[in-house]
Amino acid sequence: MPAPVVLILAAGRGECFLASGGNTHKCIGWRQSPEVAPYRWPFEENGRTFDLAIEPQITTNDLRLMLRLALAGGGITIATQETFRPYIESGKLVSLLDDFLPQFPGFYLYFPQRRNIAPKLRALIDYVKEWRQQLA
């Protein structure tokens, strides 16, 4: 199930981003590992998809750290909407440029179709299914 991507900023920190190419604001970047290129932020405009290579003040592979930094006013960051939903709804974070952000295709869970699935895997499968239904 597709999920909206959201660009977020701590409430009260300003909003202009795309016009400047994203490089005049403090940004919090994501990098899966040192061997992988930093994540480029995806955008859509007039049916055209493009992405920006940002110049972050800090780069991390820890989503919780990204969230804490954003909440502390450390910069703009990007993730799926469900990651930041409670903070946007409470007004602690502000969603930016919603009209320019693409849909994230979603996560997939691959597992063997056997009768005797290990109880821990069955619990994970059931949890993920329930979690996705709550988001729908």
Curated annotation (Swiss-Prot):
Segment forming the signal sequence: none
Similarity-based family: Belongs to the LysR transcriptional regulatory family.
Miscellaneous note of the record: Encodes the substrate-binding domain of a transcriptional regulator.
Name of the protein this chain belongs to: Putative LysR family substrate binding domain-containing protein YagP
